[in-house]
Amino acid sequence: MNTATQAPKDSADSATERFRYGFLKGNPQLTKNGELKHLLSIEGLPKAIVNHILDTADQFVSVTDREVKKVPLLRGKSVFNLFFENSTRTRTTFEIAATRLSADVLNLNINASSTSKGESLLDTINNLSAMHADMFVVRHASSGAPYLIAQHCAPHVHVINAGDGRHAHPTQGLLDMYTIRHYKKDFTKLRVAIVGDILHSRVARSDIHALTTLGVPEVRAIGPRTLLPGGLEQMGVRVFHNLDEGLKDVDVIIMLRLQNERMSGALLPSAQEYFKSWGLTPERLALAAPEAIVMHPGPMNRGVEIDSQVADGPQSVILNQVTFGIAVRMAVMGIVAGNHD
């Protein structure tokens, strides 16, 4: 990638590097009128916009139950899915969401694209824009890549961040908030625990920003010292290095997998040892509030961060997260498509 068009690279050298990313300055995802043109991060989004997305998703949930699962909101629009990292749930649910909005959906085969032959990211985007793309859904290993695209794409094009490095995964954060609201109704009375590899998790970052924006009074980060970033306390997050203590009386548990592909060294012992200390078992779940729900962004590693009895148990809402994710992504795409500078 040309240095003039290069997104910031992730580094394990600093747990608080995200606070120094230049692309966090200002709010390029909003129009001059404060409407959502791109969805790049939950950080900095007004509470009213977050709630508007969740309320709009309510309207799309019922589409799933219809005989004809389509609405004409994006008819005639072209949505390009640009996944520079592997994905199953996110790519598929974005494709389903766009199709149900009646858009024309194109999935770029990255391995066969010109980027694999040395073409810069922005040259790829400019060529796709020349094909009259209306929306880019982008997943990229480099933090800030969607910001770079949003800053340089044609004025009529909208960009949705489907996950960039360790920085953000805003639609996952939003669907997590939708799931919590569906089951718990009132954010202002909740204790929410995020457990596992928070250091490398873009989902954790998006969830923390969303939870604090929506007024959750107590957010807990639970994990080994080697997998927790610095700066959590400054964000109002309570940090626990003991799972049993951290789970006491919580209303929502969000489990995270180990992001082995983002680890630069041996930060942990074996998977079996990790499960003994940090795996969510029925016994540990019993420490939470009686009506606590269990969530996971996927993919799950059973026997590592979560026991199958919990993953498949009555308090698990993991599959419902996937279902709700379609409606939330429909809402995001529909909202941004209607807003222009």
From Swiss-Prot:
Signal peptide span: none
Domain of life: Bacteria
InterPro entries named among the record's database cross-references: Asp/Orn_carbamoyltranf_P-bd, Asp/Orn_carbamoylTrfase, Asp/Orn_carbamoylTrfase_sf, Asp_carbamoyltransf, Asp_carbamoyltransf_Asp/Orn-bd
Ligand binding (L-aspartate): 117, 202, 257
Pathway(s) the chain acts in: Pyrimidine metabolism; UMP biosynthesis via de novo pathway; (S)-dihydroorotate from bicarbonate: step 2/3
UniProt keyword terms in alphabetical order: Pyrimidine biosynthesis, Transferase
Coiled coil regions, renumbered to chain: none
Family of this protein: Belongs to the aspartate/ornithine carbamoyltransferase superfamily. ATCase family.
Described purpose of this protein according to its UniProt entry: Catalyzes the condensation of carbamoyl phosphate and aspartate to form carbamoyl aspartate and inorganic phosphate, the committed step in the de novo pyrimidine nucleotide biosynthesis pathway.
Subunit annotation: Heterododecamer (2C3:3R2) of six catalytic PyrB chains organized as two trimers (C3), and six regulatory PyrI chains organized as three dimers (R2).
PANTHER family: ASPARTATE CARBAMOYLTRANSFERASE (PTHR45753:SF6), ORNITHINE CARBAMOYLTRANSFERASE, MITOCHONDRIAL (PTHR45753)
Protein name: Aspartate carbamoyltransferase catalytic subunit
